[in-house]
Amino acid sequence: FLSLIPHIATGIAALAKHL
């Protein structure tokens, strides 16, 4: 689960950048 956190954080950052 911990290994997924960086991936999720990157996805959120990408979405924030897109918006």
UniProtKB/Swiss-Prot annotation:
GO terms for cellular component: extracellular region. Keywords: Amidation, Amphibian defense peptide, Antibiotic, Antimicrobial, Cytolysis, Fungicide, Hemolysis, Immunity, Innate immunity, Secreted. The modification Leucine amide is found at L19. Expressed by the skin glands. The keyword Secreted applies. It comes from the Eukaryota. Belongs to the frog skin active peptide (FSAP) family. Phylloseptin subfamily. This is Phylloseptin-2.1TR. It comes from Phyllomedusa trinitatis (Trinidad leaf frog).
